[in-house]
Swiss-Prot record:
Induction: Expressed in the late phase of the viral replicative cycle. InterPro entries: Papain-like_cys_pep_sf (IPR038765), Peptidase_C5 (IPR000855). The gene is L3. Its EC number is 3.4.22.39. One of its GO terms (biological process) is proteolysis. The active site is at residues 55, 72, 122. Belongs to the peptidase C5 family. Keywords: Autocatalytic cleavage, Disulfide bond, DNA-binding, Host nucleus, Hydrolase, Late protein, Protease, Thiol protease, Virion. This is Protease.
């Protein structure tokens, strides 16, 4: 197996005390956020569950700032997601109850990749992002922890893989420091998410 399973993601979130408002892990049919007055988060796969999934992304709703965060470790644009995975954020937003609000919603999404396409760590990066969301309210992207990651233009074949590879070291160090579940399952989690799992460069 490569990547991170739904069960592993839930254990990691629990070990980091990030379960408040967490709706669960979903496949591409995620219905969106349905309670606009509550903090809500989710980790969503761009593929269907019955086919094993494809790629994890994280989503979060902050009712105080009226912000919806969308985090894709590979930084794909909407058009690229549609082309590569047949997945659309816009379709999910239309299903969400948030659009029924009279207030304007701010949608923030990363525009750079932080994960190399040779890596299977998209799920781990999603958990890392949700940690930033909870710890730095209103500044899920603009904080010292998230900004410690190198960003690169989204590409199937990164021009400078080494800078993204450094992010994986930062990621593992973070989990070793913060998550008892990761420490107890370190060998397996690293083996299933390591660099070079996918031949992209």
């Amino acid at each position: 197996m490569s990547g991170t399973s739904e069960s592993e993601l839930k254990h990691l979130l629990s070990s980091l005390h990030l379960t408040y408002g967490f709706l669960g892990t979903f496949d591409c049919r995620f219905p969106g956020f349905l309670q606009k007055n509550k903090v809500q988060t989710a980790i969503v796969n761009t593929g269907p569950r019955e086919k094993g999934g494809v790629h994890w992304v994280a989503m979060a709703w902050d009712p105080i700032y009226y912000k919806m965060y969308i985090f894709d470790p590979l930084g794909w644009k909407e058009s690229q997601l549609q082309s590569l995975y047949n997945y659309s954020y816009q379709s999910m937003l239309k299903r969400s109850a948030l659009t029924e609000s009279e207030r304007c919603i701010t949608v923030e999404k990363n525009t750079q990749s932080v994960q190399c396409t040779c890596s299977g760590a998209c799920g781990l990066f999603c958990v890392f992002f949700l940690y930033c969301f909870y710890k730095y309210r209103g500044k899920a992207f603009n904080n010292e922890l998230f900004q410690s990651l190198n960003g690169a233009s989204p590409s199937l074949t990164p021009s400078d893989p080494s800078s993204l590879h450094k992010n994986q070291d930062i990621l593992y160090d973070f989990f070793i420091c913060k998550s008892s579940y990761f420490r107890h399952n370190k060998k397996m989690l690293i083996s299933n998410t390591k660099l070079g799992l996918i031949k992209s460069h």
